């Protein structure tokens, strides 16, 4: 809807400042998918499921603890086999959503973990244990017995376990005597050719409404020999499942994330981790064979061999320093991987999340230092499963990891102990003072006109998520003593929009929304993110092979014979590129622009879609985008040289008559771009 334009002078002629509507589709959201994994309480998990490993004798023989250790050291390994069992609710999904989940999302997520993890080979069938009415049970000859009777139905999450998957009901009387098999039950056929049974439902439960949760999962039964989770459940929230192509990878990553909570990455499983010899990392009670119970959390308490508290002294915050206590995962492979990743040999382990409450804290990696690792507590952009996460799964004692399945994690890589062990305020302040880059953090307050940047991997157009909060942040999360264009004394209101990252501001992908519906995203890879032609002022080209390039400091401009439009949203864009003749070539419209040296300003002047587009793109270092390709060819980027003369580049012109030139007006596109933390959830 057009507004009456005010007048302003421009040279010798009056030009119209026409606000061509505040476009609702330009509403910008920095997206965060929050996980609030609801770990099962100790009494909700069924223990003692009997399995037999392929190279062991009868599982019932001998001392179970000693037997486990011996098996652990010699066991053969095979790829993890996950059996999916659908609840009837899955079949009630809308056809498009069912096909997406059944044909793409679940198969890809399951296949990933089947290729990434190996387990000890088993033989025979798996029969799950029946649940008891009482939390008190007796264990006789390695079998779990209920008091007097078993529950009529055994649930795993929202799904009823089929009778065919269940063992007989074993009971004792209240004093632990007269132990027997309930004659009214029969053993089911059991589960063959599987190491983990995953029951899947699709119900719009109350948990689905918490933060627009997409899915949640947990384990429900553990085996007797090594305590490995052997059955679990996942619920998919129908109303939160998106079928948009540009959201598919995030949806798949969300389901992978949830599966991993059920397989081992859970606060309710840490106490059951074992070392390479199969010995428990956490001491066990003699009477139950289980770790001690944390009465407050209602989970089994791990030892310092798994998670240890570390005090960070002199943690820099606004106006001074505080002591910060962090929980560190300190298992051997995790320590080795985080030290190698950050290039910090004194790092004690991998920091766990300390915010978000029960379900987020301790059961995810710390967002501040492992931002887009998929097992942090919120997905904000390009989630990856790194070697650090695979190392944790291997350190559980239940799996061997195939590290070739890990995706490189660039966040924080090689940045040293100053990044991994100190506050983001320290990092920003130290590097600012020395004229160095403060990436991956940033200090540009989001304000109009909106100026975008590129993520460090150049995969997305992005924004600095530094915003003014409604209330002053807690002292421990105030990360600035001063900020450009912010009044003294108000710095405590400013911080990153992602609370789990300790409000440290960083460059983040975003989405354009219309009436809270995603129109397009900012990831360069997806063709669906291309702007409509009439909105493509910077001639961007999204799709496979596209990368993000910075614009110059000047706004892009569109001209016709009658009007000039300047877009007050600029800073970066997605473009295709080529690598040849030792040079990076950026493709804009139908033209190719050669980069002769880093920081070169490529002036663009191209007629397209009825407008003359004018702007500039900055050349990155050639090796960033072409180095690997040239190296594979036995070549390399050529040294910098003088750029070609301007007349070597295309410079389109308008063909206008004299009359039309005099009547030209200017329209400034002043779309109000609101950055807000719309929280999508996965749990």
Swiss-Prot record:
Residues of the active site: 258
Keywords on record: Cell cycle, Cell division, Cytoplasm, Hydrolase, Metal-binding, Metalloprotease, Mitosis, Protease, Zinc
Any one annotated GO CC term: membrane
Pfam families, per the entry: Peptidase_M8
EC number(s) recorded for this UniProt protein: 3.4.24.-
Biological process annotations from GO: brain development; cell adhesion; cell division; centrosome duplication; chromatin remodeling; electron transport chain; germ cell migration; gonad development
List of residues binding Zn(2+): 257, 261, 364
Superkingdom of source: Eukaryota
An MF annotation (GO) of this entry: metal ion binding
Cofactor dependency: Zn(2+)
Subcellular location: Cytoplasm
InterPro entries registered for this protein in UniProt: Peptidase_M8
Cofactor binding, note field: Binds 1 zinc ion per subunit.
General function of this protein: Essential for the coordination of mitotic progression, and also plays a role in cell migration.
PANTHER family named among the record's database cross-references: LEISHMANOLYSIN-LIKE PEPTIDASE
Family recorded in the similarity comment: Belongs to the peptidase M8 family.
UniProt protein name: Leishmanolysin-like peptidase
UniProt lineage: Eukaryota, Metazoa, Ecdysozoa, Arthropoda, Hexapoda
